[in-house]
Amino acid sequence: MKPLVAIVGRPNVGKSTLFNRLVGRRIALVQDEPGVTRDRHYADAEWEGRQFTFIDTGGFVPGDEDQLLQQVREQAQLAVDECDVIVFVTDARAGLTAADEAVANYLRKSGKPVVLAANKLDNTSGQMQALAGEFYRLGLGDVQALSAEHGLGMQELFDSVVARLPPKEEGEDAEAPPDDGIIRLAIIGRPNVGKSTLVNAILKEKRVVASDVAGTTRDPVDSELTYKDRKLLLTDTAGIRRKKSIAQRVEQFSVVAALKVMERSDVAVLLMDATEPAVDQDAKLAGLAEERGRALVIVVNKWDLVGADQRRQETYRESLKHSLKFVGYAPILFTSALTGSKVEKVVDVATELADQFRFRAPTPQLNRLLDHMVDNHPAPIVRGKPLRMYYIAQVAAAPPTFTITVNHPDGVPDMYKRYITNQLRKTFDLRVPIRLIFKGRPGQAKREARKRPQRQGKR
């Protein structure tokens, strides 16, 4: 998988501003709705031929100075445990603080590659550069002076990050897991929802340590089995190495753990706790599967603790569909990993989704469907002309990806995109992510450029 780069630092040093600047767009909030949110704190980047993923570790709970120090230390510890390179952000205007020194001390002892960034330097004058000088005392090497707000020093920061990445691994940049006949399932979820118990129930043996203490799974655990003549690989996502000083941030970094195994999996099995409603963390993990283009099955565990009443189950299902409507295509199952109830159903559905994940449709059938879609629901008017759909073809699987040739590739309304996606789902019974790419006909851009009136210069 792609290397992970954590952005750490105390509050108000500009971590989120730097994160948005580095990934080139503002993505702190990707869904503005009440209730469950999908705050996204990770994004892919590429520099000098290397792809990697930035993690923004923001989100502190207000408290006194002692609590703040504790939270900053926890943040640094979790970043060291989970990530390959750490960008330690400080505020050059405010100068060194006790929190900065506490984090630096821990990072220095860890031996993890660190880029020390002195933020909020809004120009390159000697006086401003001097403000960053005191941070050399932290013993973390060169200080990268920058201004996240104004975009100064970004190229140098990228260079520093890439220089500290681990050696590139074979298949590191692959967008899809290997197509070798093995179905790869990532068991993801918040701490203490029963991930290890589910794996043990599927394996019918106690191979993974299961405990009521959140964060007892220390590393991703791969387990192989043969199920109905199919080879499966189950990965129980890593929990957090539980240390006495880590108390508050286990949930946040379960996203990082899921990120680590998602890219080498076909299907994400999102485990939830039946005794609790869906929370932000569940939405983040579901959103991660959608954004990474992985098949997703939502499994509500511990159903034995709330009763098997069918009406209650349907009420919970409808609540989930509302909370997680951005993955409305994903099946929702109810199980008890502890008792083994409906565990085989989870594997059956996950196996079906893995096949759909690699589905390929015949081109003639696709184009007959396209004609049918346009006949039933004519394309809208774009820039004063009808939107014309000429041709559709599948260009990739894992997930199914289709290109549609049109006369206005950048003018297709979102509503019509959803219509096409839903028709593809209905026709081919696809309950996995679908990607659509709209493109113009060959030479279309040149023809349109020739049609544009030429501006006349002054005579």
UniProtKB/Swiss-Prot annotation:
Keyword Cell membrane: no
Domain of life of the organism encoding this protein: Bacteria
Domain called KH-like: residue spans: 359-442
Binding site for GTP 1: 9-16, 56-60, 119-122
Record key words, sorted: GTP-binding, Nucleotide-binding, Repeat, Ribosome biogenesis
Stored SUPFAM superfamilies: P-loop containing nucleoside triphosphate hydrolases (SSF52540)
Family annotation (InterPro entries): AAA+_ATPase, G_ENGA, GTP-bd, GTPase_Der, KH_dom-like, KH_dom-like_a/b, P-loop_NTPase, Small_GTP-bd
Nucleotidyltransferase found in the keyword field: no
Pfam families linked: KH_dom-like (PF14714), MMR_HSR1 (PF01926)
Domain EngA-type G: 3-169, 183-358
SMART domains (UniProt xref): AAA
CDD domains assigned to the protein according to its UniProt record, in alphabetical order: EngA1, EngA2
Residues reported in the UniProt entry to bind GTP 2: 189-196, 236-240, 301-304
An example molecular function term from Gene Ontology annotations: ribosome binding
A GO biological-process term: ribosome biogenesis
Function per UniProt: GTPase that plays an essential role in the late steps of ribosome biogenesis.
Family annotation (PANTHER family): GTPASE DER
Quaternary structure (record): Associates with the 50S ribosomal subunit.
Assigned protein family: Belongs to the TRAFAC class TrmE-Era-EngA-EngB-Septin-like GTPase superfamily. EngA (Der) GTPase family.
Identification of the protein by name: GTPase Der
Natural source organism: Myxococcus xanthus (strain DK1622)
